[in-house]
Amino acid sequence: MANILDRYGIKEVADVTFYDVNDDGSRGAPVLYLDTLKVSTIEQTAEEAEARGGKGNPPLIIWDYGKEITVTLEDALFSVKSMAIMFGDGTADDLTTITKTQTFKGTTAPTQYTILGGKTVSITSSTIYDVTGSVVTSDSLQADTTYFQTFDLTVTGSSIEISAQTFPGTYYVTGDTYARSETTGKDEFFQFIIPKAKVQSENTITLEAEGDPSVFNMNLRVMRPADGVMMKLVKYDLGE
């Protein structure tokens, strides 16, 4: 039984784990673990209807309905898996080739492409365009003229496909943090449990040269599972 005089403060972000949802609604295998979050926010809202009457027309009875619980996660870092969950169906495929374009001037097209760290990779085949977008041959290149060279490179990486029919999925979500006791000044365990959370489709990636590094936001909308319990807030102690 909770002591009504016990009070706690929270000043720490949560580590959040996403799980698959099994066919019976139970928690499945973990699919994503986030331990680099900057902000993790839980917000509950609802609508109201009320009966008013009497002198001054004050509210007499208030009905609450339309409960909404949303969770906002702001991550300092991203992984291939987190990006796949944010923008697609949670899957990522192996990538073997990419297309690159570089500019050059002169009568000879480059045969190498410079990557990070000053390393170079060979260009085995390319297409050259002039500033009007027309294809030109290597023997027609002119000095002091700018051209665009497009080519494919063999790479190792991952690809996330975002199609018109692909949207983020629904997951069982838990978040673990600490609550500090006013009495003892010690941290105790605190967890939120969401049996059914839909990842929202609205996402933004900011790429800019100045300012703070980009953050990666994931917004969740809490849904009602079969037993009606949309979320649990648990403060617990593992004991000595």
Segments the model singles out, each with a brief description of its role:
Residues 66-70, 140-148:
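Extracellular interaction modules
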Residues 80-142, 152-186:
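Extended beta-strand solenoid/passenger and fiber regions
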Residues 24-27, 183-187:
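Short, solvent-exposed loop/turn segments that connect beta-strands within catalytic domains
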Residues 20, 75-79, 153, 175-181, ...:
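Beta-strand elements of well-folded, non-transmembrane domains
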